[in-house]
Amino acid sequence: MTTQRSPGLFRRLAHGSLVKQILVGLVLGILLAWISKPAAEAVGLLGTLFVGALKAVAPILVLMLVMASIANHQHGQKTNILPILFLYLLGTFSAALAAVVFSFAFPSTLHLSSSAGDISPPSGIVEVMRGLVMSMVSNPIDALLKGNYIGILVWAIGLGFALRHGNETTKNLVNDMSNAVTFMVKLVIRFAPIGIFGLVSSTLATTGFSTLWGYAQLLVVLVGCMLLVALVVNPLLVWWKIRRNPFPLVLLCLRESGVYAFFTRSSAANIPVNMALCEKLNLDRDTYSVSIPLGATINMAGAAITITVLTLAAVNTLGIPVDLPTALLLSVVASLCACGASGVAGGSLLLIPLACNMFGISNDIAMQVVAVGFIIGVLQDSCETALNSSTDVLFTAAACQAEDDRLANSALRN
């Protein structure tokens, strides 16, 4: 008679559901912050290490994946970058428009009394776009060190096309390097429960949420608008693309991408997570290896919402009337600003003065609005990143599935 041994604890942890493990890490992090504040602050190192590891591996992952996919691209094989790019831009503009409607329906006001410190926002939209264009011609080593994904994409695409003319041994080497980096990414992601345990513990211990209660209405409008975009606007765009129930895909992306992004608060750190999810969904590698890092740079629905809501809150506070054409123009400006947010230190918050300038709001008052943004940043930045990053993989999957459906229907007709 033989007895079958039950799998050990380590084996269960290594092969169990990552989402369930993350939930356990989340609960344990909250409990530790509640029981012992010093201990919770100490384990914050685990979260810092996890986010640092993701940020470290993401640039080289993007470089190798894009190089490998372009170098090994077969002639005549179609990618779906243009449809995805269109979805990115449409999604960002739709988010800004939804934020305008939400802000009119639930107007918020601010207490403009704090200072934003020595922060230098860009002087205009031209400067934002100039920074975005200049990042394309960055030194490749500098781009890798600083996580400049526009620069990394440009070099990876250029080297990929150049390597198309190389011999098969070189192409195989690039492909093997890409697979090796992908393996390292999977290894890092397995430590997500420990990392999120550290992040949650330290965040609750060091900041708490007591300071957020003074801005409860503003946060409700911000987070409510982001939920509206995630659960209504994005599903409508996905349904328009794939013509079937979008919610299984939407909820999967929120669960397996948005949860990570919420706690890491970094679109760059979430690139490896999104790449792994695309592989799990069996999407075209040539497509997602380009669209995911591109989305982390320009697909900024959450940033568009933040810029729009905080700007209109300042407008309401000062009693400035806003007509429909001006509101539509604000949506366009917020969308353009959001697309350039990755190239600005401080991200979406420091682009608020550009939008405020539309209404003749002085820079001093605009920087006080930015200061409010930093106060609520614990929750605002987490929700914004979760929406931005989960939308990257959502729109990539929608475009790839739509193309697969088109090819299948074409084959049936023939």
Curated annotation (Swiss-Prot):
Taxonomic classification: Bacteria, Pseudomonadati, Pseudomonadota, Gammaproteobacteria, Enterobacterales
GO cellular component, one term: plasma membrane
PANTHER family attached to this UniProt entry: PROTON/GLUTAMATE-ASPARTATE SYMPORTER, SERINE_THREONINE TRANSPORTER SSTT
Cited function: Involved in the import of serine and threonine into the cell, with the concomitant import of sodium (symport system).
Periplasmic side: 37-45, 105-142, 201-217, 321-331
Known catalytic reactions: L-serine(in) + Na(+)(in) = L-serine(out) + Na(+)(out); L-threonine(in) + Na(+)(in) = L-threonine(out) + Na(+)(out)
Keyword field: Amino-acid transport, Cell inner membrane, Cell membrane, Membrane, Symport, Transmembrane, Transmembrane helix, Transport
GO term, biological process aspect, one: serine transport
TM region positions: 16-36, 46-66, 84-104, 143-163, 180-200, 218-238, 300-320, 332-352
Name of the encoding gene: sstT
Species: Shigella dysenteriae serotype 1 (strain Sd197)
Record's subcellular location: Cell inner membrane
Membrane topology: Multi-pass membrane protein
InterPro entries, sorted: Na-dicarboxylate_symporter (IPR001991), Na:dicarbo_symporter_sf (IPR036458), Ser_Thr_transp_SstT (IPR023025)
Cytoplasmic side: 2-15, 67-83, 164-179, 239-299, 353-414
Name of the protein described by the UniProt record: Serine/threonine transporter SstT
Presence of keyword Transport: yes
Highest taxon, organism lineage: Bacteria
SUPFAM superfamilies referenced in this protein's UniProt entry, alphabetically: Proton glutamate symport protein (SSF118215)
Family matches, as Pfam families: SDF
Gene Ontology MF terms in the entry: neutral L-amino acid:sodium symporter activity
